[in-house]
């Protein structure tokens, strides 16, 4: 028994050179139960001392517009007022959202009272006045952060801020200064959001976030006049980190913040203040022209104030203070740019989108070097490709005497047809999957009477009165006032009376609109200077409020002027209903500021009609282009004019949509917008009653616009993303449910666009990888108005669209995962879909609900059965948690429906009280995980389980058990395939397999929670014990937490066990002392020998001698942890000793040693404790390093033998040359020093290949990452196209070419779609070759002083996926094949490769063939070629022999067919693996 913990001793080394060409670290997120596409790009900042901003540029298909374009975000944590239940009132009734977006409530202290105190000090720093400090707790606890709201006791004393204590000991302050608050400019005490301003770590390191407020710079006079109160928005402008002087407390608590010279590193976000040309190095301070205004400015009003967004971030810049880092004179030092990420946009008046990001760095002479841009494109609304009208036969039965409406009556996310047959007789045709059409084809089911709806009478209407997302049938006739709700099954509920129907409900000017902002239909009467508001309270209305408007606001009144349309619509794209007035020559909008208040009117230019013919009844409002703003459709007799709303600022020029031949639109015609395609986008449906009723449809788009759908790295890889509406998945689900004779039940009443498929295409090899997702059981919580995700997700890792480089069938794996939605109506039915092919499998898990009880010093979870009310909140805490996962292989075999593995989880939800007695907080954890390894053998699985029996108050596991169930009893008949070798099944059984094994693990932790400390989960001690039982002792229904804590538990104190070991962590200050907040690990202690293992010495050494030897070897006797009765001590080893600096040294380690018997390795740091510059071992041997502080990477190393090692780094930190020199046998040896013989790495591969021997480096490298991009010059375009610069500037503006002339894949594609390409341009591009990204490394075999030096030249090509595509190494002269200019082999008259004797001879690696999953199938033999350039076609070879590797759906190699046709096979089973070589399989080969 030994469990050694070895400490990694810090060693100095130089970075290595060469290797594959990599991208910028971008990554696509895995599909999850929410169906969103996620993507992230790292920002160009260094790690500093190891504490750096945790930021990236991230995309989500569910995100809106912002400073980085549609869908993109880069924001630090924040706390905001909740707006989902209404516009904030800025009083004590407002709720707050945690950084994770959860509603927070005031927490309780250990005495059960509000955790509120008064304080005038923070982190030991006196504050200028007293604060009321209130601890808040999110409803859904994820990581046990501590959140405090600091409010001045006297409101006149200052402004409130927030403190967040992270479990890792970091302290964050939000909104301390005005620049980090989003607030009402006219009343700064009305704060909407508090933004992260500063972070301090336990080691005294700080990160400071600086924000810029919106202003009027570079805005037009019209923009300023319409939006004068524009300063609320905040933009992240700069992040400072790497403070020179440590400080335990937050800098913002001091009288003054440190000046900029006190920071070593800066990350700057540039919004157009600096030049964006790559040929001009951006300065730290920025230019004088100010930031740029975006064309798609937009505002949000959900906080009751206007938050105007006018800016786009154009670049992110990393700066270092190199003089300070190098310990040189810092007087007037200006930070130096070390990395740059440029952001290019497709600027659009409706929606601006990020289309490219590119890394740029600079040589010391200021010349730029670049990486290929990572490009993006989006599903777009193409005004030039709107299809024509087509008849709609689904409606042909309806005429003008049958009122009908396209409406989603059952809440399925796509509308059906509601119509009236005779007075009082209502029918509905729900949407169905169309049989025989394409996979998204929608039709309508058989008509279904709605018998339970009361007879339609005056005052009845369909509306969502309670805000649950479903329609209600509201009846407001005399004597009958109430509503029927519709259940997800389509059945109507019993009548619910309305107790507070306002008397003015029947007023002719009363309107229903969401003015409170809670998503409910409020009753409102509008006058010119006031609004009477009856707020909807989820089924009843509050008493009337008369809201007087501001002096400069006069509201339009409905019905006053027949020549104008007054309505509520989202003309501004903020997600709210605003008041709009449309006349023949103007559109005015009064922003909805919440609770009956409206802002000053905004005029949206661009819409006009002749005064004499304008008819408000011909105006229709709908979001046509998917931008979130309502567009205007005006119906003429012969056409529809569509005015696209440009981000709530203006309307575009109208698009004319001709009506079908012979159709004249008049007042008898009907026009409506509805999602009849089930794609989540609007189509136009027109009914023309004459001469005979005809119904038409026009699908304005086939895809939801503005979703990211293509990414191209310009290195050869393109990723395509495909979306599908949740309504389409529901129709699939509905079809299956109805086919099974069951009642379909939809719980997601609106469509969402979900990540359906992804394709990654390698443009170089033609390899195409695919992945597909299917979703079911969508869920919506109508009470909290939140999406809960999908209950089932099916993922396939390939499909029929995948393409390998060779025609080898590739079978997909299929993972079926079930997730909790927190809605019992869904979650309790999921188990019916689980695989049931193993009748001996244990029953599925059910959740456990507990309360935290302080019944002991440590506290414990006590199980309870929650009330129906509490169960709602505790179930909600499980949303998104994985319940079960089954892994299959869809290879078409009979075993395809038997899983390879099944994993299932059990969750525990701990209820934690808050001051809101109606809503508990909850923490969800996984307490049981059970895994079956079937390998498609249902009767003989391996089964294991992990159970967390007890966790402490902060969620750290204290007691857990790992269970390995015994193998099931041997059946009479083997369940394995008949082709297995004889006796294998019998011989696979072993008595150990029939044993039940349990391993108990006990743990303890340090939690530092006193005063201003908050550091959780520091490991303290751990012990493992093993239990072994006969097969019969395993419970028939399996283990659960309950069986393991029962009085007869198999891990009870009275059960025999085997001690398996222990470990303990000692922190600086001693084993039993509380560690400091810095948590400095002094050493680790591990048990090595116990009384059983010591039996090996019996008869060899007496106990006294043995103990003396053990003591002398450094072992110590220590008591067993978690000791049971009188257990003997164990021998332990202490390892991994460290000594640390003090506060002034940022608590950095100063020495390390493995044990006390070994010598120390001391560490010397640079002046600012960023990097180790010297190490000295126990023999006093010293290693020193000098650093390039652009990258915090060593470039020069003096080793223990005083030898010098030296590398040259390019501006991206890549090693491009290395050399070394020193002594050998007491004499100078090695390469010439850089001072004696400088060496400049050639700029191109051609120049490097021309180098002659005698170069003073051991290695040099040249990278060509942009070689897959064609390169144009302005001269080429001007000469071929007779261009005077106009075309070239247009190409630059359209991102067809980069500033340095590289042709962008997606920019070119967009240009071709909009403008096409002339023959001359196509010819020019065809003449420019594309070469896969590649690099050259030159390695010398001896020093430059030796005239026999040889240069080994090796070139590596990468494919689009970053895999090695081809390698070429220069060899001696001889025979080789020839490469033609079209990248194929030159052949002779017989069609075989032609041979030539050449001095330019290269050994080229053979081609690798891949299957549809990107797995290597064949690797062919290398060959000689007379050129190093990439050979794309070697089909002329006659020696294409290779083994063929075939994989199962999980990607495991199961068969190899050798080049001679023999086979090696491997078969996987739950308990053994069968390997057969060529001799074993020879008998099965066809002769």
Curated annotation (Swiss-Prot):
Q: Which UniProt keywords apply?
A: Secreted, Virulence
**Activity regulation, per record:** Toxin complex is secreted when grown at 25 degrees Celsius or less; at higher temperatures the proteins are present intracellularly but not secreted.
Localization per Swiss-Prot or TrEMBL? Secreted
Specify where it is mainly localized: secreted
Region of interest called SpvB-like domain, as start-end residue ranges on this chain: 27-378
Chain segments carrying region 5-bladed beta-propeller domain: 389-698
A Pfam family = TcdB_toxin_midN
Entry GO terms, CC: cytoplasm; extracellular region
Q: Is Secreted tagged as a keyword?
A: yes
Q: What's this chain's function?
A: Part of an orally active toxin complex (TC) with strong insecticidal effects on larvae of the Coleoptera Costelytra zealandica, Acrossidius tasmania and Adoryphorus couloni and some Lepidoptera larvae. The TC has an endochitinase activity.
Q: Which family does it belong to?
A: In the N-terminal section; belongs to the SpvB family.
Tell what the record comments on domains: Residues 389-698 form a 5-bladed beta-propeller domain which closes one end of the shell; the other end of the shell is closed by the RHS repeat-associated core domain in YenC2.
Subunit and interaction comment: Semipurified toxin complex consists of at least YenA1-YenA2-YenB-YenC1-YenC2-Chi1-Chi2. YenB and the N-terminus of YenC2 form a large hollow shell of beta-strands. The shell is closed at both ends, within which the C-terminus of YenC2 is probably found. The Yen-TC:K9 subcomplex is about 26 nm tall and 22 nm in diameter with 5-fold symmetry and 5 copies of YenA1, YenA2, Chi1 and Chi2; the chitinase subunits may be solvent accessible on the exterior the complex. The Yen-TC:K9 subcomplex has no insecticidal activity.
What is the name of the protein in this document?
Toxin subunit YenB
